[in-house]
Amino acid sequence: MGNTLTGRSNAIAPIISAEDAKTYISDEEYRRIRQAFQRFKNGCINYDEFCYHVLGGAQIPEEKRRLLFSFFSHGAETISFDNLLSSLVGLCRVEEVQSRFIEEYHEFASWGLSPPKLTIPLNDSYISFYEVMSYVTHLSVNEVIELEKVFATISDRAVCKLNEEKWKQALGGCFPDSYAERLFAVFDENRDGQIDFRELVCTLSALCRGPLPGRISQLARIWDVDCDKLLSDEELSNMYKDLNVPEEHQTVTKSSNGKSALVDFGIWAQENEKYVNEYYSMALQIGHICLGLRPESRKMELQIVNEFEKRASELPLSEWNIVASGWHAELRSFLEADKNPNPIDNSGIKGTREDSWTSKVACISAESARLKPDLIPSDYIRVPVPLWRAWLRWHGCALTVDSQFTRKYLDGEFFEDNKPALELYPLEILLLGHDRKKSQDGTENTPRSLTSWACAQVSRSMTVDELLALCKTELRLGDGDARLWQVVKENEEGNVLLDDGAQNLHQLYSSLGKTKKVNKMKLLLEVRERGTGVWPEELRASLSGKQITAASTLSSNAQLSDSSGRPGAVGLVNYGNFCYRNAGIQCLARVSPLTQYFLDEDNLDAIKRGNLRRGDAAETTIEYAKLLREMWAAKKKNIAPNDFNDAIRLSSDMFECSEQHDCQEFVAFLLDQLHTSMYESNKSLHPSPEESEGTDSNKLSDSSKKKEADKEEADEEKAERSWTEYEKQNESLVTQLFTGQLRSRLICRTCQSSSSVFEPFTSLSLPIGFEDVDLYQVIVVHRDGRIPRRYGFRLSRDSKVGNLREVVAVSSGISMSHLTIQCMSSKGTLMSRSPNHRSSNLRDELPLSSFPSGARLYALELPESTGEDQWRVAMHRKLQYNHEPYILGSTAGFIVSRFGLPLIVGLDEEVTGKKLYEDVMYQMHRFMEHSVNSSSSRAHDPCEDENSGYPFTLCLVDPNYEWCGQCPALRFCRGCPIRPDESKVFIPANCPIAVDWLPIALYLRYNHSQEQACEDDPSVAETWSRHFAPSSLEHCIEKFSCPETLDAAIQCDRCEKKTMRDKVMTIWKLPKYLIIHLKRFEFLREQGRMGKCKRTVNFPLKHFDPAPFVDKPDGNTYECIALANHYGQLSCGHFIAYAKSNEDKWLLLNDCSVREVSEEEVDKQGAYLLFYERKDVK
């Protein structure tokens, strides 16, 4: 059976063969181990896998782990299955192997009396939730499991509960709203506004299973508004009214203090069943068809389905499923004969794929099945979606693919006869894409050919935006990265850009003039190039010189019906990541005096004469003027500004590459180019007089006198002189239109004396901005078991735990010395306390920025004795039998799960086990169901009685709440229990406590909804609003003018010493056209990168009065004439423009697309550049 021992050097102990090992285990155990081993990809187990999957992550010292691995592997680098089986069974089941192993390796001596368990026995300690639910209801374990599968598909996955919205969706609009709402309240036993799975199972059992009188009695809860399980006179009156009970039959007995118990209603209902039949029938239909309960018999299924179909046949549902009439008739006959029905068979109405695009490319829509052409009403029946899903669960489907036909019921506008009908034949869309391969010559600037990408079967009522969203979801694209085109001819010109997202596909299909029976249409999904930002179709148009046609310009009902007749309403083709240029040009073009200047041929000739050397600025200006002329000629719907972009490339290296750039920088650069060429032109026409009069010494003397005069000159005079000098040196139309004046003051912080400097500006850059604060929400848990309260705080990013404790103490009224902060990850793991894990308290100096993302913060009240080692954190825990294949029972035989709120357990010198248990029970009384309610919708277990003992066991565990906190790791102990008696308890340092729940008590007495209940302090809403609320233009200007203390001291003439100064920037004078730059991009020093502030800035489109923020206001107001928006990130975002037309209408200018929008449709959220025009007071 075994071999002789070898030396410790290769760490191999005597083993048995794999064949011998099989005789010590059952066939089921062998299959389990074999299945668990098959999960390893390479057919063997390496050291890391051995530590995790076999040893279960237990904190065994490294040396012993290595020794065990060598024993299992026979000294090899990996473990084969035979070696695993023989070693595992030998150590767990064979006494001779165990004794020889221990003799050789004394450090494993504890395995002599208690060897590792190969298999964990299944007993009540590890009973599953399904078994508990089956035990207290009339449902089997399999029925509970099946219900859970359905519940997962209809509930809110984030919280695993049914809210009212999800409840209505599950019912599919097939029942009266009032009835659905009241039945929801019946299922919601704890009245928290949600139905958890336990409530669903128990209520379904009460309504649909067991003795009929009990089921009928539960129906009375529909009218039990106050949830006291009794019907008052008012509730009885409402019941009689809803059921249309005549007065002579209003005879429900009142057996409980003048009120009717549920059983009284049940007795009355059996005697007067004709009044309650409809309500009870609807409850059965909802329970079985909508919520997933399988009918007990074929007779019951036939009854439920017949009543449901009769109810739903005339309902105005928007969506139906199509089923073959033949199978439906067969189903009915089988159920009537008490035979098992065949699976759903729609082959009789299923169409072919011969001419379908689904046979060539993938389908991205939910369905791709086609119906046979020319079906008549007798070929099929329509059924509500909930019934179709129920049939799938109960009977399955004969066809593995293309078996489901979900169709919409549409208004008459979608059909030739203008009558509402079922859309039997949806549109089939073939989606083309650009070939991702390089062109034959290897360049990127050649138009790509179109190729079939995918298809979709969608309703005519679907809008362009909805179809585009479907495509972007499939490709995981962001906003602005894709758009749709209507294909007229593949790989030829004439495709139509679908820029009107509200347009439905029926309108597009009708515009093609195809016959009704075709039902096919080709669309192009254009995706922007990731690296260059180029739109392939705009590149095609640019190279070919062809026009791009947008659907909005062709729509008969569009107000912008003929953009070619409207000056300036022209799109600009983006063929090289030039959206920042296009947006800037469209905005700047709305400055009427500047545009009119360049439209005048004489002015352009003057610029050419004044810039004879034709410098870079002149070239850019001339090309800009040509571009404006083409835009205002309005002979084209869109223009490819090739020559202008070439001039930009030659003028500056800044914009040479095809990467994304800043629209504000481009506008500033373009204005500077325009100004330079205008200035040179003016200078050549009006040369300035010679300035060479006088000597250099005279000039120096004049300069000294000027400096002396500055000291006594008033700010008004200084500003006027500075402005006059600036105008004289920068004479141009750009200066007249765009230049304003700022005042920069340095204020002595000691004597308050100040000095001013005046500076010109052409755009006002305003901070939004990035606040150096983070938002924290902390749940304060009191020891008296009251409902926890959540507080909100905004703290600086360098705050520590101590700062958080301080503000929590002030808000909650708990002294700081009686608070501990605990951080729990989204997986229920408490954050490490300190490097040596000697304390349960997070260190005050720990930065809050170290908390993981999505973590929950708790502030727990400590007991009166608050010494460092006089309290412990307790966590709820459950041990559940592992039904999945595992290798070693001691480490993987059950699953350890943590849940719920952490608790604080006090440890004074005289603490006993009973005192610990009572302390935990006291803190949990809020979410424990204490009394057994005789009217509940389920049976009750003896453990629910408060006199049956504690429903949990307190165990000493390690800081991870996985293993024992005091036993050696080789014992594989999950936690030593604390006895609930009067004996004193010793709890080692760094040893928290686990609250191990008995399964039945956990599933029946622990109310998870109440445990999660939390009251919000007003500070939560207040801090949230402050943190995420939109800013305003006024607030941004105020931040712009906030004092900033300089780093270095400056000599003060009045103080006669160096003093600290505050620098204050204010607006002295505004220009005719004010460009405001909202600084969304700033450098984040903590993260070492540029970041974007996405906060919305509210600003007026009309009647903006800047007077409160201007030192010398003139009483004029401003009106917004254009704005450039940015979406996405700096390196891969997209710019668009909104601008006013000559007719004072707002236009959306998105590269080549131009569409008229209302003022309300102007998107302010992404505003980046604002262009305001002054409205002078007459």
From Swiss-Prot:
Sequence ranges assigned to domain USP in this UniProt record: 570-1175
UniProt entry tagged with the keyword Chloroplast: no
Record-linked InterPro entries: DUSP-like_sf, EF-hand-dom_pair, EF_Hand_1_Ca_BS, EF_hand_dom, Papain-like_cys_pep_sf, Pept_C19_DUSP, Peptidase_C19_UCH, Ub_carboxyl-term_hydrolase
Disruption phenotype: RNAi-mediated knockdown causes embryonic lethality. Embryos have impaired cleavage after fertilization and a failure to form a functional paternal microtubule-organizing center (MTOC). Due to a lack of cytokinesis, embryos become multinucleated.
GO cellular component: cytoplasm; microtubule organizing center; nucleus
Matches recorded under SUPFAM superfamilies: Cysteine proteinases, DUSP-like, EF-hand
Any one Gene Ontology molecular-function term assigned to this protein's record: calcium ion binding
DUSP domain residues: 296-410
Record: residues binding Ca(2+) 1: 188, 190, 192, 194, 199
Identification of the protein by name: Ubiquitin carboxyl-terminal hydrolase cyk-3
Phylogenetic lineage: Eukaryota, Metazoa, Ecdysozoa, Nematoda, Chromadorea
